[in-house]
């Protein structure tokens, strides 16, 4: 089992390793030292009784209320209670784990003032496999979902552990862990920041990387089985419009289809291909750029201090608590909205290619790739499913961060809505994988419609992997199991690994 050690720069791959693949988490000596150093300042501030938001005062519009030192532990617990109000179906376990990992990254920055023992409990919960039950709706960018994680930490709420859903206290007990008694400022720390936005957006970015490369793979296969031409992928065309991601996409397609016997057999069959094939570099390229832009934003966000207030050492040896708004989620939210647009565009082109594969008027193949038309429908309905998914993606492409409502007695008269953006980005990736799965299934069936099935080395590898889950279809059969199986192969990066083993590394 891999271990991710925190203390340096954390990456999206680190987050996915922990959240999705169960890697363990450890703290470096540097991580522990900076946490303890900052906590000492918070303890001193608490004893001195200075007016510091969330430490000696209430939250939101209650910032005007001073909290006596004797009541601060009670207030921290009450803060968790009050903010635990998300609703609806629970988020996926990998999303909860991603949130907990982000907490460790953000709160361990050395500027929040959280205690090391509180962070250690989050780490130990991750390593033990305790996953708080977190409802998925009702966040403007922070606070409510995070409250449900805090509830389990204090021995309340609900969590899953070893396949069972348990009371939070019982889950901790079975794992040999004890609840934490929150100290000054810690309730606020656990609730504040861009935890959920960063978590969902990071998972979405990882999947968007996977999908954008898989689109190159599926699109290449489609080009080949539709007797296309590589002319539009020529390096000279790319060189005079030198967007790096356009250049890389064309290079991927050329590599996958290198020395294709099928393309050679049909050389000159068409003057040029339809736009959904000819224009892959010009659409897949911008999608990759959008993913890279989001990745750059989230790489910063994952390694940021996002609480309010934040604690800083001063050059003269003093210490200051600065009230600000690093907890705002617009950076990650706007990046997520852009991801939704990008992945919808990617799938728009995939859907056009699916139509060309199934439409005998343009494919020069049997209608709906149906090899036994007397009693069968072929793959007609796979296009309906894909079109429905595209409709959902278009809805999710509407930006979330442009929305606003005033909250908290006008003290928080603007809210970022970053969580809604990040959640729909995560959901969009889930939908998009099925559209690419549909294209790959159609590709495989199209190849089977030829008597001479000799194809490029890259596409042969794709076909062979596809056939481990999806049989050649001579008669109608339920398609859902095959869509699910291929979609899982896609998200597992099986097609990327298989193609790279055959033709070399793809460019992203």
Where are the regions that the model predicts?
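Conserved SET/PR-domain catalytic core that frames the SAM/AdoMet-binding pocket
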Residues: 49-51
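Short secondary-structure transition/capping motifs
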Residues: 27, 31, 64, 68, ...
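Generic internal hydrophobic packing segments that stabilize the cores of diverse globular domains
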Residues: 39, 76, 96, 115-123
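C-terminal auxiliary extensions adjacent to catalytic cores
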Residues: 2-23, 27-34, 38-41, 45-46, ...
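Short alpha-helical scaffolding segments that buttress acidic/His motifs in well-ordered protein cores
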Residues: 15, 79, 83, 95, ...
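FAD-binding core of FAD-dependent oxidoreductases
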Residues: 53-75, 82-107, 133-156, 164, ...
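A broadly tuned "polar low-complexity/structure-edge" signature
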Residues: 97, 124-128, 465
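FAD-binding glycine-rich core of flavoenzymes that anchor FAD
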Residues: 110-139
């Amino acid at each position: 089992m891999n271990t991710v050690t925190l203390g340096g720069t954390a990456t999206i791959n680190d987050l996915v390793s922990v959240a999705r693949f169960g890697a363990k988490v450890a703290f470096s000596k540097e991580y522990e030292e900076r946490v303890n150093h900052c906590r000492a300042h918070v303890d001193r501030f608490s004893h001195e009784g200075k007016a510091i938001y969330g430490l000696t005062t209430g939250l939101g519009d209650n910032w005007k209320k001073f909290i006596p030192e004797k009541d601060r532990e009670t207030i921290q617990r009450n803060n968790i209670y009050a903010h635990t109000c998300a609703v609806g179906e629970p988020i996926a376990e990998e999303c909860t784990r991603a949130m907990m990992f982000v907490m460790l990254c953000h709160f361990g920055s050395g500027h929040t003032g959280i205690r090391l023992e509180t962070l250690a409990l989050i780490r130990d919960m991750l390593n033990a496999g305790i996953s708080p039950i977190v409802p998925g709706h009702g966040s403007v960018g922070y606070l409510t979902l995070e409250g449900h994680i805090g509830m389990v930490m204090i021995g309340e709420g609900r969590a899953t552990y070893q396949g069972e859903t348990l009371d939070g206290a019982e889950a901790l007990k079975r794992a040999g862990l004890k609840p934490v008694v929150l100290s000054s400022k810690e309730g606020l720390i656990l609730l504040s920041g861009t935890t959920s936005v960063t978590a969902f957006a990071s998972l979405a970015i990882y999947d968007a990387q996977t999908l954008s490369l898989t689109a190159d793979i599926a699109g290449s296969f489609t080009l080949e089985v539709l007797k296309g031409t590589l002319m539009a992928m020529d390096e000279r065309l790319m060189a005079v419009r030198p967007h790096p991601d356009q250049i890389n996409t064309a290079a991927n397609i050329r590599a996958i289809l290198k020395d294709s016997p099928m393309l050679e057999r049909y050389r000159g069959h068409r003057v040029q291909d339809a736009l959904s094939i000819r224009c892959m570099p010009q659409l897949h390229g911008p999608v990759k750029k959008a993913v890279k832009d989001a990745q750059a934003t989230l790489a910063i966000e994952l390694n940021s201090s996002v609480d309010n207030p934040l604690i800083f050492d001063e050059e003269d040896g003093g210490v200051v608590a600065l009230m600000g708004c690093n907890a705002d989620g617009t950076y990650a939210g706007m990046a997520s909205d852009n991801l939704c647009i990008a992945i919808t565009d990617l799938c728009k082109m995939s859907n056009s290619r699916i139509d060309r594969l199934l439409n005998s008027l343009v494919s020069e193949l049997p209608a709906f790739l149906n090899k036994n038309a007397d009693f069968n429908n072929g793959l007609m309905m796979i296009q309906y499913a894909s079109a429905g998914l595209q409709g959902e993606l278009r809805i999710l492409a509407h930006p979330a961060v442009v929305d606003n409502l005033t909250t908290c007695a006008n003290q928080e008269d603007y809210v970022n809505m970053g969580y809604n953006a990040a959640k729909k980005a995560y959901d969009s990736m889930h939908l998009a994988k099925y559209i690419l799965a549909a294209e790959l299934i159609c590709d495989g069936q199209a190849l089977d419609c030829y008597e001479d099935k000799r194809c490029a080395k890259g596409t042969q590898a794709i076909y062979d992997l596809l056939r481990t889950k999806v049989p050649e279809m001579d008669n109608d059969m339920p398609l859902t199991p095959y869509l699910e199986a291929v979609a899982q192969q896609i998200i597992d990066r099986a097609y990327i690994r298989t193609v790279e083993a055959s033709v070399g590394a793809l460019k992203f």
